[in-house]
Regions:
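Short, structured segments at the rim of ligand-binding sites
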Residues: 1-420
Length: 420
């Protein structure tokens, strides 16, 4: 097990470039198998989830060459439709391959995917959407067998605007003759990026970013060179690091439009946030002011992936604030660790009430998922003394060299091997 050891008390200051988005890169990697031609992806974050996804693609027969943050993929030799069990269980994004493989080969087999333990994230919406496109699905012993021999275009009505289901159905439909429509589609910017990527390969997707997406099937897709969008959650986390330490942070290559909900909350807490073209500049007060309430929502609402970071900020703010988690039911698991550091957080169901305290104190805490681990690291930046965040490898799932980024901004943080 690895851990971050953080000594708090330093204001973070400086300029940092935002990495490519994990939640854009993973579905785009999956969509790369829709063509037999070469795809070049630039600016790909070299995080553990991306490495595992490329391992899965390689085992399926895809040839991949890595040069720094550039991946060159050739899926022309893809020859397997059954995804490797062990790797699929480690990474939830393996489910993204279901749609593209069905589209290419009209059959696919996948085990139930893994990922962070942040509550139930059923894939029933993925499967019901694929059934609407004519896929016959048989589930047995945690294995999903899909027969797409009679796949056809169609109308898909999602009960909830699921990001993953929207992306999977989009990728499954792109090579089907006729017109498919996704109703109640998710609107996240990463979906827009995926649709733009597919269109750049010769696809015909309209309405991405709205509640109704239309996919007109094409016969084939060609190769392309593409750069995934910058990561709005990494950007928000870095801004939160500046805010909790009373510092000044400038982000370059920032996804400004995608950060509006986060920036609005930071302003409520007393931060000065300036938004320019591809830049965000935050200047934080000595002590933050608690916002009255935050509710997570699908985009363009406040992102659930930034909720626990804001919980850390709220814990040292002046006043009392309420956080309501509407997306996942198990996302306050790190409140106990923050309380161990001196926070005053009371959780009940999907609601957390936070009474701000003047100081946090270093402690040994444990990351249980990647966003919670990042939030505990932020708390350590503010705390008096030394904080050890066990489970740094979980943070690596979504942040590339997180400790290096924070060190560049002035943090005292190092990675160590830790005993359980």
């Amino acid at each position: 097990m690895e851990a971050f050891v953080v000594r708090g008390g330093r204001k973070l200051e400086g300029t940092i470039r935002v990495d490519g988005a994990k939640n854009a890169a993973l579905p785009i990697l999956a969509a790369s198998v829709l063509t037999e031609e070469t795809v070049v992806l630039q600016g790909v974050p070299m995080i553990s989830d991306v490495r595992k996804m490329t391992d899965i693609l390689t085992m399926l027969g895809c040839r991949i060459r890595r040069d720094g943050h550039t991946l060159t993929l050739d899926a022309g030799g893809l020859n397997r439709t059954e995804m490797p069990d062990a790797l699929s269980k480690q990474i939830r994004s393996s489910i993204f391959l279901l749609g593209p493989i069905l589209s290419r080969f009209r059959q696919a087999t996948v085990t139930y995917p893994g990922g962070c333990e942040i509550g139930l994230r059923p894939i029933d919406l993925h499967l019901s959407g694929l059934r609407s496109l004519g896929v016959v699905i048989h589930e047995e012993g945690g294995v999903i067998h899909c027969d797409g021999g009679n796949m056809h275009s169609g109308e898909v009505h999602l009960d909830y605007p699921s990001v993953g289901a929207t992306e999977n159905i989009l990728m499954a439909a792109v090579l089907l003759p006729g017109i498919s429509v996704i109703h109640n589609a998710a609107r996240e910017p990463e979906i827009v990026d995926l649709a733009n990527f597919i269109n750049a390969m010769g696809g015909s997707v309209r309405g991405a970013g709205s509640a109704v997406m239309t996919i007109e099937g094409v016969k084939r897709l060609h190769g392309v060179q593409w750069t995934p969008m910058p990561d709005r959650i990494v950007a928000g986390t870095l801004l939160a690091a500046g805010a909790i330490t009373g510092g000044t942070i400038e982000l370059t290559r920032a996804p400004v439009q995608a950060l509006l909900a986060v920036n609005a909350k930071l302003r409520e807490m007393g931060c000065d946030v300036r938004e320019e073209e591809k830049r965000v500049i935050l200047t934080a007060p000595e002590r933050l002011t608690a916002f009255a309430q935050l509710q997570t929502q699908p985009y363009p609402g406040f992102p659930t992936d930034m909720q626990v970071q804001m919980l850390a900020l709220l814990s040292v703010s002046e006043g009392t604030g309420v956080v309501v988690e509407n997306v996942f039911e198990n996302r306050f698991t790190h409140a106990g660790d923050l309380n161990r550091m001196g926070a005053r957080i009371l959780c009940s169901g999907r609601t957390a009430v936070v009474r701000g305290v003047p100081e946090l104190y270093g402690a040994r805490v444990t990351a249980r998922d990647l966003r919670g681990g990042a939030a505990l690291t932020l708390a350590g930046l503010k705390a008096q003394g030394e904080t050890q965040v066990d489970g740094a490898e979980l943070i690596d799932r979504g942040y590339e060299h997180f400790e290096t980024q924070l060190t560049c901004l002035g943090a005292d943080i190092r990675r160590v091997h830790a005993n359980a």
